[in-house]
Amino acid sequence: MALFSKTKAAISPPPTKAAAAGSSYNSNQGAAMVGQYYTYTEGVLFSQAMSVPTIARAQQLIASVIASMKLKMYTEMWNGEEMEQVPLAPRSWLRRIDRANTNNHILSWTVSDLMMFGRAFWYITERTADGYPASFTRLPAAMCTTRDQAGSPAGVWFAPSKEVYFNGGEINPKDLVQFLNGQPGIVYSAQKAIATSIKLEDARFRNASSAIPAGVLQVQAGSEPLSSTELADLAASFNAARATNQTAALSPEVHYIETATSPDKMLLVDSAEFQAMEMSRVCGVPAYLLNISVGSYAYTNSTEARQDLWTFGCKQIAECITQTLSANNVLPNGTCVEFDIDDFIDGDLMEQSDKMEMPQPPRNNGVPYSS
């Protein structure tokens, strides 16, 4: 007979107070700025990075996957052979992290902060009677600074900060949940690559908006020189004739020379493909998932593509979130949180495949079957 029940619940008691209401922190001016959304900003570095199409696509893929999955709670118990996960009833905030927002929204922007800045911040707005958090709100990472860890230019964070300033005001670190990514934020670690992509896109924009002639009329050497007005009139009359006739006529003194510029050269297609590949390396997402041409590549079905996206793009950030939320400052010791990834990896696909595999009607000696 088991000594412990596997139906143990971890339902949180009703919240009784806000996190900052009874704070004994000496300076907590930053808490007064929480929720003042008109002051919120994502910063210049974030805007520059998201202006690169490949980075924007990678962020959309990773954020859409993680933010669409449900969180579930469990504890671990020794069953005589190995540690076994025992499901627990979730605390109320797992279904509504921020009472004023959806889980999809707060998790999407948390993923963005972890990708771009290497860290993210949640402020605890309410606590339950046992002292554990009951509700959170996200603080934009671009507005949070840490005096004990500069972070830039490498974007490396060594541990949760004890001196956090939000929007210029110091905030009690005990009222914060600090998520630290295992990789540097790309706005710090890939500044040159991002700047190169932006300059390349600017060059393509200039070329796209500039009118390059399809050909040049060249007056031969030894001929009577023409003034600028005469040259302009000659080109205009030539264009008018070509617009209404299939055949053009030129005197021996004037030659028509086609320009060697092609649309792919004008739009720097090869350079753009290479830079997109570089950005896929920066984001850690396989290039084929970002619709980048990778030459000859083995066929990959939908299930394998999902597994690649989860393994190479999402797993580390998802683990950062769940391990942080499983810490003792968020949940009681021994209580853990994880994402339910079954539906994403193969759950719904298996259901679809079962529906598609319908029994075929019988065939007899080539005679068509009729119902």
Regions inferred by a protein language model and the residue ranges of each:
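Active-site-proximal structural scaffolding
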Residues: 115, 210, 230-231, 272, ...
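Structured, contiguous alpha/beta core segments that scaffold functional sites
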Residues: 2-268, 272-274, 278, 353, ...
